[in-house]
Amino acid sequence: MEIKLKKTNYVSGVIEVPSDKSITHRAVMLSSLAEGNSIVRDYLPSDDCNRTIEAFRQMGVEIKIDNGSLYVKGAGLKLAKPQNGKYNIYAGNSGTTTRLLSGILAGQDFETVITGDDSLSKRPMRRVILPLSQMGANIKSNDGLLPLIIKGRNPLKELNYESDKSTAQVKSAILFAGLFADGATTYKEPVKSRDHSERMLKAFGVNIKVNGNFVTVYPAEKLIAQDITVPGDISSAAFFIAAALIVPDSNLTIRNVGVNPTRDGLIEVLKQMGADITLANMREISQEPVCDIVVKYSKLKAADIDASLVPRMVDEIPVFVLIATQADGITRISGAKELRVKESDRIESVTSQFKKLGAQIESLEDGFIINGNSKFNLAGTIVDSFDDHRIAMTLAIASLIAEGETIIRDSHCVDISFPGFYKVLNNICR
């Protein structure tokens, strides 16, 4: 499937973006392990999150959907054993499902095989295999790739683990496994990554301590069912923040967006660049800070992003590159090598497609150099999404300032995180 898009005069309106993908995954997982009935309100019904829901249904958890909410009858920390010797779980394109679920399955007394689509089957899994194996799980893989064959044990061994990367998926897998350990499990990372798991574990009654980049989780006897409301996803809002900033005369309000301080790197750096962004109606919902984001067209200046900021905006970097093409001066992004092992090699994907659009951009092993110019319009052409939802949405926003017509190949992949993206985009274009 491909879509044809054209330059717009300006964007305006009041919109909401889909619920947070990261929080939805975690809410489904912990609700499934809790005792009692949990409600996950305003969950994200995307392809990725549906994989997590189906995985737990397959393992005997009763999950009903009604009017945009999930009603989860928790099975407790011990999931039902498979009737035919092992579970076969298909994770689709979802790295979150695969890695976080691995931590839970490591503490179950049965065998599970996890497979995925072609893209997921190329993504590195050693980062979770190694620590979970140290805790006592028996995990086999295809040379560090899917399929994973996980034979869990209970209890697992406590672990003191220091990661050389700041990745919330690895951290969460270890913390979830720590629920089933025989003692305290501690995780240390170079820079604090998104902390949705820590916040939610605490909400479900888990004894967890956070001290800077250290997190310690203690074994759990049970999780307590919760009523959770999932806020809008800042990573989805980022595309419309970009649209309002780079299309002249634009003024856009995005309501009910989660602005967790471990996810607000994009907003911080954009304000440093001169962006007119206001966070209004700040409040807290289900342990997460939420607000309405008001964005107006702004003349921007270039900025530098390094490894200390990347974990707080890793998913937003592709669309940040687009913004940087419209910021006066040279923007440098480093410390973002993790982009090479996402749904596509996002460093290569972004660089190759923005060169097609006429941008002055060079790739680095761990980032980009962008020579931006606020007076420069991109040139529409045929571009590839590489079946990567964030690349497709970035290119769609780029089309708003591209002369002529932009055709995006494999445009349907946006459904991974943002069903209805093109409809929302069409509604704000004037």
Curated annotation (Swiss-Prot):
Record's signal peptide: none
Active site: 315 (proton acceptor)
CDD domains: EPSP_synthase (cd01556)
Location of this chain's protein in the cell: Cytoplasm
Pfam families xrefs: EPSP_synthase (PF00275)
Any one Gene Ontology BP term: chorismate biosynthetic process
Catalytic activity reported: 3-phosphoshikimate + phosphoenolpyruvate = 5-O-(1-carboxyvinyl)-3-phosphoshikimate + phosphate
Gene Ontology, cellular component aspect: cytoplasm
Keyword Cytoplasm: yes
A molecular function (GO) term: 3-phosphoshikimate 1-carboxyvinyltransferase activity
The protein's annotated pathway: Metabolic intermediate biosynthesis; chorismate biosynthesis; chorismate from D-erythrose 4-phosphate and phosphoenolpyruvate: step 6/7
Residue sites binding phosphoenolpyruvate per the record: 21, 95, 123, 169, 346, 390
InterPro entries tied to this protein: Enolpyruvate_Tfrase_dom (IPR001986), Enolpyruvate_Tfrase_sf (IPR036968), EPSP_synthase (IPR006264), EPSP_synthase_CS (IPR023193), RNA3'P_cycl/enolpyr_Trfase_a/b (IPR013792)
Function according to Swiss-Prot or TrEMBL: Catalyzes the transfer of the enolpyruvyl moiety of phosphoenolpyruvate (PEP) to the 5-hydroxyl of shikimate-3-phosphate (S3P) to produce enolpyruvyl shikimate-3-phosphate and inorganic phosphate.
Family: Belongs to the EPSP synthase family.
PANTHER family in the cross-refs: AROM/DEHYDROQUINATE SYNTHASE, PENTAFUNCTIONAL AROM POLYPEPTIDE
Protein's recorded name: 3-phosphoshikimate 1-carboxyvinyltransferase
Upper lineage: Bacteria, Pseudomonadati, Elusimicrobiota, Endomicrobiia, Endomicrobiales
Name of encoding gene: aroA
